[in-house]
């Protein structure tokens, strides 16, 4: 379950609770929950609905041709999300226009975000910054990577390391949609060294083509970095070798994932294997992939069946992040070997759904 190591042995869980209609529930207390680690009851040490811990956010945007028709809507919606999550300009102290919302909380010192786009390469467009202007500039300028080196590989269901070798000019070079590599690199290289509350927001069709990392590698990296992953699935159309794809469907909403209804030369690495990799007979089921990424990391899954509802989805993500509970506990057993520990958080209220991570990795003791 979603964790950040605040102290050597203290575990922190960001927790979202929703009712049967998918509405956020924000009036619960520690007494409403039961917590276990590896099947053993644990004592909740602290429980709060808001925190001064800084937010570290990462926007990961699929710029492959399969989702190209939604790019303009995605730029605008992601820009508004940046204003919601970083509402105070660091230079002037003035709020962004339209940045207030029912769920918004005061910004903690140190709140910052970065932007990555991925297609046949993974490219860091803007490193961690608290500047809305820098993020808006890169979002507005964001385009698919030049196709000079593109060699669209087969869809990757996460079972093996498929794709083409080498590192790209702005990141990894290879197939057509390096989703797993983007998650891995964002988690391992950017998020892992940071403290505070950490979340990735991913916009994609979920069909990986060409990544070196597997689906489990990507999720494992997010777990090790204590990162929640929120996913936005937009189907688009299958990529074609001659031109851009067509449209994707009509209005949609939320579901699955536990929710009712430049950096060239980034290194690779291995990961764990704690779950299956869903695929349909026709190939990878991108929707199931995006649902699994969200559910296994304590985030939420959303489906944008219509590009015009991206604003609504980003607003829901912002509210979920700002209104989540933060729970801490000290495990009853000490693990100095860096093992994975399964965490289960439940509430006695049967009409509510608790959303948090599957578990956490214990810190390895210094030799």
Where do the language-model regions lie?
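Scaffold/interface architecture of coatomer-like assemblies
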Residues: 1-367
């Amino acid at each position: 379950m979603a964790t950040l190591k605040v102290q050597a042995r203290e575990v922190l869980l960001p927790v979202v609770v929703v009712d049967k209609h998918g509405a956020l529930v924000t009036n619960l207390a520690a007494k409403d929950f039961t917590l276990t680690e590896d099947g053993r009851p644990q004592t909740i040490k602290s429980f709060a609905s808001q925190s001064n811990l800084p937010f570290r956010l990462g926007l990961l945007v699929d710029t492959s041709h399969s989702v190209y028709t939604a790019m303009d809507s995605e730029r605008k919606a992601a820009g508004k999300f940046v204003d919601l999550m970083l509402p105070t300009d660091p230079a002037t102290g003035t709020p962004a226009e339209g940045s207030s919302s029912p769920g918004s909380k005061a910004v903690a010192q140190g709140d910052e975000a970065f932007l990555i786009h991925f297609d046949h390469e993974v490219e860091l467009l803007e490193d961690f910054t608290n500047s809305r202007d820098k993020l808006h500039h890169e979002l507005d300028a964001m385009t698919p990577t030049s196709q000079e080196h593109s060699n669209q590989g087969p869809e990757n269901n996460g079972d093996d390391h498929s794709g083409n070798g080498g590192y790209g000019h702005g990141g990894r070079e290879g197939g057509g949609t390096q989703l797993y590599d983007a998650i891995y690199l964002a988690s391992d290289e950017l998020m892992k060294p940071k403290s505070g509350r950490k979340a990735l927001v991913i916009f994609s069709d979920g069909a990986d083509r060409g990544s070196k990392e597997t689906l489990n590698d990507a999720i494992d990296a997010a777990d090790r970095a204590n990162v929640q992953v929120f996913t936005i699935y937009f189907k688009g159309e299958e990529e074609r070798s001659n031109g851009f794809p067509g449209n994707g469907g009509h209005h949609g909403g939320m579901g699955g994932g536990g929710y009712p209804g430049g950096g060239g030369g980034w290194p690779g690495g291995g990961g764990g294997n704690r779950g299956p990799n869903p695929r349909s007979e026709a190939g990878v089921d991108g929707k199931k992939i995006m649902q699994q990424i969200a559910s296994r990391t304590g985030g939420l899954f959303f489906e944008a069946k219509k590009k015009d509802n991206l604003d609504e989805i980003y607003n829901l993500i912002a509210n979920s992040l700002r209104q989540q509970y933060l729970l801490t506990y000290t495990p009853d057993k000490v693990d100095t070997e860096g093992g994975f520990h399964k965490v289960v958080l439940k509430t006695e209220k049967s009409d509510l759904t608790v959303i948090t991570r599957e578990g956490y990795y214990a810190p390895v003791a210094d030799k």
